[in-house]
A protein has these predicted regions:
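Helix-to-beta-strand junctions that scaffold the AdoMet/dcAdoMet cofactor pocket
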Residues: 304-306
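C-terminal substrate-binding/catalytic core of Rossmann-like NAD(P)-dependent dehydrogenases/reductases
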Residues: 268-276, 280-281, 318-369, 380
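Glycine-rich beta-strand-centered segment in the early N-terminal region that forms part
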Residues: 50-66, 79-132, 157, 179
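C-terminal hydrophobic helical "lid"/dimerization subdomain
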Residues: 21-31, 298-302, 345-398
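NAD(P)H dinucleotide-binding glycine-rich loop of Rossmann-like/cofactor-binding domains
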Residues: 106, 125-214
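Adenosine-nucleotide cofactor-binding segment
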Residues: 216-219, 231-299
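Short N-terminal strand-loop motif that marks the start
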Residues: 3-93, 162-166, 170, 181, ...
Length: 398
């Protein structure tokens, strides 16, 4: 009887603590915690700081995991954004351990409480009242994200840390309650949103349909997720193009029905014929260019039929100039070209549904995460990403 009373008492304490915005029993918040601070190119060091005081509009999140993005790898290698010193990590997720009294719902209006799992999206400092129904792309273009913020007194500005501090009010943070998704799915939300947005951009051309012949060039994480998004939407005539046979095999598991290894062909003419043969003697109705290689962009026009479409989404940094012949590649073929850059708030909501659908039909999404490292091994994690020895690399806290 005494044991039952203790259990009931503990349950009541946890319920009450969730209502009052404090950490539940057994989840004591320390006074100090660690961040992985990038102090110079190709070097993180773990630094300990006092956790900030949580204000009425703020949220303190215990980090559970964070994917390593190509953007993180580029910043780690060359600091192209000039952010050093910086706490990186923007593909993160974790559990709310404390929140201000004014925090009641997430950006979609879904109730939140201590113990819920969340992800962050964009930061709209210039327009903190923006909602997920404001789809003007110019608003998104000027947004920030946690994990690419300049260092300041808060310190806990990125997901490569023990905790992350989500600032409320006029700071313009957006976040979503994703407690109904498992950890691997939550880590994949941000990169999947990039592809959900790219497919939505492609649909604006009016060319991408259920029976479209589609080429996806590049079978890294972005290209593989692109194939999965297309497959879940009912596009089942997909040709994957890459130079890595293992990645091409994975592409088939994600929904590609044919593959072409460009390493087996000399010259763009031979490669084009191979792509055409893989699609029953036809050029593609639509193509997605998912690499950051300028030569790949130059070549992909050859794979597309007259009047077809192309979505370029591979260049998240300046990868150099690509050379095309505007007459032969674009004008005379009347190619419909769209660029795609990150995502908007609505794309995040769509991404949650995509991940549930992908899991339901058996797509191996979680297998995209090939390497998991603790925070203490973050330098090794970034080096693994640069070496391209896996697909998706993630930092997963104990």
């Amino acid at each position: 009887m005494d044991m039952n009373n203790v259990n009931i008492e503990e349950i009541v304490k946890q319920v009450l603590s969730g209502m009052t915005g404090n950490a539940p029993a057994g989840n004591t918040i320390p006074k100090k915690a660690r961040v992985a601070m990038m102090t110079e190119k190709k070097h993180f060091e773990l630094q300990e700081y006092d956790l900030p005081e949580v204000g009425d509009d703020d949220i303190l999140v215990k980090v559970e995991g964070c994917g390593v993005c190509g953007t993180d790898a580029h910043e780690y290698k060359n600091d192209p954004f000039g952010l050093i010193p910086v706490v990186l990590g923007h593909e993160g997720t974790g559990e709310i351990v404390k929140m201000g009294k004014n925090v009641k719902v997430d950006t979609a209006g879904k109730p939140v409480k201590v113990g819920d799992k969340i992800v962050t999206c964009m930061i709209f400092k210039d327009d903190p009242e923006i909602t997920m129904f404001d789809l003007n792309k110019k608003n998104v273009g000027g947004a920030d994200v946690y994990g690419l913020l300049p260092d300041d007194d808060v310190k806990f500005n990125g997901w490569f840390a023990d905790y992350i501090f989500i600032r409320g009010g006029k700071f313009g943070s957006t976040f979503f309650n994703v407690s109904d998704l498992d950890l691997d799915s939550r880590i994949l939300i941000e990169p999947c949103a990039v592809l959900v947005h790219a497919v939505e951009r492609a649909k604006t051309t009016g060319i991408l349909k259920f029976n479209s012949r589609v080429v996806v060039q590049g079978c890294g994480p972005i290209g593989l997720i692109c194939i999965a998004v297309l497959h879940t939407m009912g596009v089942h005539n997909i040709c994957a193009v890459d130079g890595n046979e293992k990645r091409l095999e994975f592409a088939k598991r994600m929904g590609a029905n044919t593959t072409v290894n460009f390493m087996n062909f000399k010259g763009i003419e031979a490669l084009t014929e191979a792509v055409k043969e893989a699609q029953g003697g036809h050029l593609a109705d639509f193509a997605f260019q998912c690499t950051g290689n300028p030569h790949a962009h130059s070549n992909i026009y050859k794979f597309i039929r007259n009047g077809g479409g192309l979505c370029e989404l591979g260049f998240f940094i300046n990868g150099g100039d690509a050379t095309i012949n505007p007459h032969f590649d674009l004008c005379s073929k009347e190619i419909n070209l769209v660029g795609s850059w990150v995502y908007n708030l609505r794309d995040y909501a769509t991404t949650f549904d995509f991940l549930k659908r992908a899991k339901a039909i058996g797509l191996p999404m979680s297998e995209l995460i090939t390497h998991k490292f603790p925070l203490e091994e973050i330098n090794e994690a970034l080096e693994t990403n640069l070496a391209m020895t896996g697909l998706k690399i993630a930092i997963v806290n104990k």
